[in-house]
Amino acid sequence: MTPPSQEIVLDGPGISRALERMAHGIVARFPGEPLAIVGLLSQGDVIARRLVDKVKELGVEAQYGSIDISLYRDDIFKLEARPSLRSSNLPFSTDDMRVVLVDDVLYTGRTIRAALNALFDYGRPARIELACLIDRGGREVPIQPDYTGHVLDHAGAKVIVSMKEADGEDSVVIPSH
């Protein structure tokens, strides 16, 4: 349960509505192209799996994949601890596919830059789009989402995304200081 001292940005039903809107946007744009929805480990993959399910409910087939970007980060040598490596799961070729990369929170854009580098190691997609549940603003690189669940105007605020599959509940909160 979310402590009352935290600002609730989205609750479970709010996350569900946001993902529904994102799925409708994905389906409406570029219909007929082969589609893969690829989540960034560790929360983007959960969101991506839900988006695949919602897109399928709308009558569009989409392949699911997940990608670990740990070794592609530009701050890997500045980290105090070694990143924990997880296996990417892309059981299909991304060549000539429309790939929607999915992350939980978009902030500086550096994570997505790393994800693009990782994705190109798997092939040459026809088109890459970006979906994020939360857009925090604060870009340091020129990356913008194509599909967004919620835009925050709390520049620099820490955001915690919890997903039922990994954390037992769906919520997006801003912790109090």
Curated annotation (Swiss-Prot):
Gene3D superfamilies membership: 3.40.50.2020
MF (Gene Ontology) = uracil phosphoribosyltransferase activity
Q: Which family does it belong to?
A: Belongs to the purine/pyrimidine phosphoribosyltransferase family. PyrR subfamily.
Name of the featured protein: Bifunctional protein PyrR
Motif PRPP-binding: which residue numbers?
A: 99-111
Write the record's keywords in alphabetical order, separated by commas.
Glycosyltransferase, Transcription, Transcription regulation, Transferase
**Which transformation does this protein catalyse, written as a reaction?**
UMP + diphosphate = 5-phospho-alpha-D-ribose 1-diphosphate + uracil
The UniProt record lists the EC number as 2.4.2.9
Function of the protein: Regulates the transcription of the pyrimidine nucleotide (pyr) operon in response to exogenous pyrimidines.
Highest taxon of source:
Bacteria
- Single Gene Ontology BP annotation: regulation of DNA-templated transcription
Q: Which organism is it from?
A: Akkermansia muciniphila (strain ATCC BAA-835 / DSM 22959 / JCM 33894 / BCRC 81048 / CCUG 64013 / CIP 107961 / Muc)
Q: In this UniProt entry, which cysteines form S-S bonds?
A: none
